[in-house]
A protein has these predicted regions:
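Signature aromatic-anchored transmembrane alpha helix within multi-pass, membrane-resident enzymes
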Residues: 8-11, 227, 279-283, 387, ...
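Transmembrane-helix signature of polytopic, membrane-embedded enzymes
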Residues: 6-8, 102-118, 146-170, 189
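C-terminal luminal/periplasmic domains and tails of membrane-associated envelope-modifying transferases
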Residues: 456-895
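Membrane-lumen/periplasm interface segments of multi-pass, membrane-embedded glycan/lipid transferases
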Residues: 294-370, 484-498
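Transmembrane alpha-helix segments characteristic
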Residues: 12, 162-164, 257, 283, ...
């Protein structure tokens, strides 16, 4: 069996890349919408975009700072296509996309897609697919160039060249990237062919010396080398990395192709003419672009204008931080991370590539050992050639990552041909030469199966809408029917919770089934929360229905469907708590009211039992690290629901990871979005390595703090002016500023005339009351009492409230009970935990009521058992327990 020719792999790659391109919805690749905006800006005759976009309007954002070669080619290809509908594509942006790679379906789409994008393509969809095909051609050129590169370096290893081309053609990440609108495929193609041409030029130089060939061949090679170097720098800034590589390869040594030994390390002066020609041509190709940047931004690279848009890396992020937190993401995304860097493959896929990589590296080590022993310097030179370019590209990626957050494997694709050749060379060393004819086809079968499965098994399901269901199918998918209406026409048909108990950091799934009875003009989001007994949010998901793919305006009336929503419990939940799930429909400005089947209004959310949250008695176990110095390993919070002016009691547990790099202080703040702060305490950290310190703090909330939910946040900073240290957890960096959201603090409303704290069982609390008259009413008058209740927890049992006016014998007095809100509002099991409710009752005192002292009696009872909930009086004076297990609220005098 002879090795396949390069044409086979070029064809195979083209087929697969087109398959990926057609499978991925428009704009669902890294920055694809911004890359295409660059193309469109040129195609519309507006020239090259300038920065910043708020001053020179365009939609390309930071991508407008990219060198223009790819975009000029794409604009020339699509200039004739009408694209009046393009802005409608940009208008359908998903406000809640997933930002990190996850292997389950969850808002991977950055845009909402409609049938207007389907085949046959027209307008903007046609133009975008045309540019995607252009990228596919550049990717195919990379496959062909990889084959030529391997054949040039290792001409006796035919299966190595075939294996290298096969590896590039079947790498899912490269297939995905080459099927999108971006400049990565062109950058990879140019870099790969530059490696080939640089080899050709060295060989032509030697043939000229030995065979006295005409200098024209060498001149053409130098011009072609310069064209490729210039094109690389005009495609992507990383293309400039080819320049020092070319100088090093051409200037330091040349290779004798007959003996394949390193024999000449002379200074590059003998090749000064060639250098001037090569780099002169390169500058002629790309120099105008860098001069333009210098004139516009004072920086030839344009980074001075780009970095404010893409964002600078947090202060203190170093090389060790990269390897500890983001190198793994580079590895994953090199092989198979899709979407906007947010759609991962199953874990076993990466284990396959890890095994293949490990085998390739082991084989390379074996090759190097054998080559040294056998003095095969040519093989070592070939490995060094590829390894040097791979190292330069990797250093460039790390340098970029230390500047801004851009840790993605696609940035290594300029060296994809070198990587594939090295891996194929390593695999070939692990088997006898005769077995390679079976090894590479077997590996190709595995890689082909993976590359074919991923579009259908991972990519397509992530962007699919929920399937329509019959009533019977809905009943099979839910454990509890709901029949709750939101607004005028949207119904929640039922639900199912997949877990009964969860721990901090765990993800569980909730199934909700929906149906619209009429057209819905507005796009409403699903807001699903897991609440603790204090009504604080332990987990939350806000999304378009269909996990981002099926906005309500696209629903068909009368068609039901079910969604499965992932909820990840915050790892900072402070204590074990019963969980209550709350679901509602909302926009950015309004929340739809909910109604049960009896027509009772449920507020703006439907509540149903959720899983309990199990937290160790010692508190949550954490590992949040500021820099590489200090870790927060746990905390304890005494109370999370407080009144203005009350004291927050907090203990933080710190551990020093190494000697501190200078003075360090920790700040604890209670604040809202926008920075409105109601409490702050700063204390210095004095820790020895390995020591765990219990940092006990008491903070008084502002006396005028408005009621609502606030964030409790923690940060470590340099008090001498160095700023906050970056904070990391599990490889994830938090936003700049180093503030870690720890938990929520609810500030309750205090507006009652008479404040108290009386609990009825463990479920509800009376916070206070107001009376229409102080403590005196006339016979025949109307007495109105307003009670302020707070729900502490949901236990799933019914409860009704009551209010009586008792006489001196503690029996209800005669008179007319006019009305009570407790008889008209929804049952308590619809209440929201932590929310304060007003309960208003009115009595008309009998006209013949005898004078005397009367009591107002309040309480709660269970209608299923007829038993009352005993009050526990925690605050207030003059209150006593009645013989009926109720609270005697206050005395009322009738003269």
């Amino acid at each position: 069996m002879s090795p396949p020719r390069s044409a086979l792999y070029v064809f195979l790659f083209t087929f697969l890349a087109v398959l990926y391109s057609l499978t991925v919805p428009l704009f669902e690749g890294n920055d694809e919408s911004w890359h295409y905006a660059y193309v469109w800006h040129i195609a519309e005759g507006k020239g090259l975009p300038r920065q910043p976009p708020d001053q020179y309007p365009h939609l390309a954002r930071q991508e407008a700072s990219q060198p223009p070669l790819y975009y000029l080619l794409a604009a020339a290809l699509t200039r004739w296509v009408p694209q009046e509908d393009l802005l409608a594509l940009y208008a359908r942006e998903n406000p809640f996309p997933t930002l990190l790679p996850v292997a389950h379906r969850d808002n991977q789409n950055h845009y909402v897609h409609t049938d207007a994008e389907r085949f046959p393509y027209r307008g903007a969809a046609l133009a975008i697919h045309m540019v995607r095909l252009l990228s596919v051609l550049f990717g195919a050129g990379t496959v062909w160039g990889t084959y030529r590169l391997a054949r040039k370096l290792f001409p006796q290893e035919g299966w190595v060249a075939a294996g290298a081309a096969m590896m590039v053609a079947l790498t899912p990440g490269f297939l995905f990237t080459s099927g999108l609108v971006n400049n990565d495929a062109l950058a990879a193609c140019i870099a790969t062919w530059a490696l080939v041409v640089l080899l050709n030029r060295r060989e032509r130089k030697e043939r000229q010396e030995k065979q006295n060939l005409c200098a024209l061949c060498d001149l053409c090679g130098e011009i072609l080398s310069g064209l490729l170097l210039g094109a690389a720098a005009l495609t992507k800034l990383s293309g400039l990395l080819l320049w020092p590589f070319a100088a090093l390869v051409l200037g330091v040594y040349h290779e004798d192709t007959k003996t394949r030994s390193l024999k000449n390390f002379s200074f590059v002066s003998s090749r000064l003419r060639g250098f001037i020609l090569i780099f002169g041509v390169a500058l002629a190709v790309c120099g105008w672009w860098y001069l333009r940047n210098w004139r516009l931004y004072g920086d030839p690279t344009g980074l001075a204008a780009m970095l404010p848009l893409v964002g600078h890396r947090e202060m203190g992020f170093g090389l060790m931080d990269f390897f500890q937190t983001e190198a793994r993401l580079v590895w994953l995304s090199y092989w198979a991370v899709f979407g906007w860097f947010n759609l991962a493959a199953p874990g076993w896929v990466y284990r396959v590539y890890a095994l293949l990589t490990a085998l390739g590296v082991a084989g390379l080590v074996l090759l190097i050992v054998r080559a040294v022993r056998q003095k095969r310097w040519g093989d070592l030179a070939g490995v060094g050639y590829l390894a040097l370019w791979s190292l330069i590209v990797a250093v460039g990626l790390v340098r970029w990552t230390l500047t801004t957050g851009g840790s993605q494997g696609r940035l290594l694709y300029p060296a994809v041909g070198a990587h594939a050749t090295l891996l194929a060379l390593g695999w070939a060393q692990l088997v006898p030469a005769r077995a390679r004819r079976w090894l590479f086809p077997a590996l190709g079968g595995v890689l082909l199966a993976l590359a074919l499965w991923l579009p259908f098994g991972v990519i397509r399901p992530a962007y699919a809408r929920p399937a329509p269901l019959t009533a019977a199918e809905v009943a099979d998918r839910v454990s509890q029917p709901a029949d709750v209406r939101f607004g005028e026409s949207i119904y929640l048909l039922g639900y199912q919770v997949d877990a009964k108990e969860v721990r901090p950091g765990e993800t569980f799934w909730v199934t909700l089934c929906w149906q619209a009875e009429g057209p819905v003009a507005e796009d409403y989001f699903v807001s699903l929360s897991l609440l603790t007994a204090d009504g604080l949010t332990a987990a939350r998901k806000v999304t378009h229905p269909g996990l981002g793919t099926f906005p309500t305006s696209l629903w068909t009336p009368g068609v039901a469907f079910c969604d499965r929503y992932p909820l990840t419990v915050r790892d900072t939940v402070p204590t074990t708590a019963a969980g209550v799930l709350a679901v509602g429909l909302t926009t950015f400005t309004e929340r739809l009211p909910g109604y049960n089947k009896e027509g009772w209004r449920l507020g703006d959310a439907f509540r149903f039992p959720g899983p309990s949250i199990s937290v160790p008695d010692s508190g949550p176990i954490l590992d949040y690290r500021w820099g590489r110095e200090v870790a927060l390993v746990g905390y304890r919070l005494e109370r999370a629901v407080l009144a203005p002016g009350e004291e927050l009691d907090l203990t933080l547990y710190w551990r020093a990871l190494r000697p501190l790099g200078g003075p360090r202080s920790a700040t604890v703040q209670v604040l809202r979005d926008g920075g409105y702060k109601i409490a702050q305490v700063d204390l210095p950290l004095n820790l020895e390595p390995g020591e765990v310190w219990a940092d006990h703090r008491k903070m008084t909330l502002a006396a005028d703090a408005p009621p609502g939910v606030y964030e409790l946040k923690v940060a470590v900073y340099d008090p001498t002016g160095g700023g906050a240290l970056p904070v990391y957890a599990g490889g994830r960096a938090f936003p700049a500023g180093g503030l870690l959201p720890l938990w929520e603090i609810r500030v309750r409303e205090v507006s009652q005339d008479h404040q108290m704290d009386v609990r009825f069982g463990k479920m509800i609390r009376l916070l206070g009351y107001t009376l229409s008259s102080d403590d005196r009413v006339e016979p025949g008058d109307v007495l109105t009492v307003t009670l302020y209740w707070e729900l502490l927890a949901q236990n799933g049992r019914p409860a009704n409230s009551f209010v009586h006016l008792l006489g001196t014998t503690f029996n209800p007095v005669s008179g007319n009970f006019l009305w009570g809100q407790g008889d008209k509002r929804p049952p308590i099991n619809w209440w929201e935990v932590g929310r304060i409710y007003e309960d208003v009752y009115a009595f008309q005192v009998a006209s013949n009521a005898p004078p005397g002292e009367y009591w107002l009696e309040v309480g709660w009872w269970d209608p299923s058992t007829q038993e009352r909930y005993s009050p526990q009086i925690l605050k207030g004076e003059g209150s006593v327990l009645s013989e009926w297990d109720s609270l005697l609220l206050t005395e009322i005098a009738i003269p």
